[in-house]
UniProtKB/Swiss-Prot annotation:
Membrane topology: Single-pass membrane protein
Protein name, per record: Putative uncharacterized protein DDB_G0280355
Keywords for this protein: Membrane, Transmembrane, Transmembrane helix
Example of a GO cellular component annotation carried by this entry: membrane
Spans traversing the lipid bilayer: 24-46
Localization annotation: Membrane
Length: 55
């Protein structure tokens, strides 16, 4: 499965979803799930949160 920004944009125009932070998070999560696998994306998110907390 491969995504790019254009496909996502066209998909959104088709479905007409309101893009909220939640939908963006879900998109990011699904994207990273297909891109690097579940555990890696989960670790990445935790790592990002950890970095933001310790700035």
């Amino acid at each position: 499965m491969s995504f790019n920004k254009t496909t996502l944009f066209l998909l959104f125009k088709k479905i007409k979803i309101n893009i909220t932070p939640t939908t963006l998070f879900i998109i990011f999560f699904t994207y990273s799930y297909y891109y690097c696998g579940f555990l890696q994306s989960f670790n990445y998110i935790i790592y990002k949160i950890y970095l933001n907390k310790n700035k």
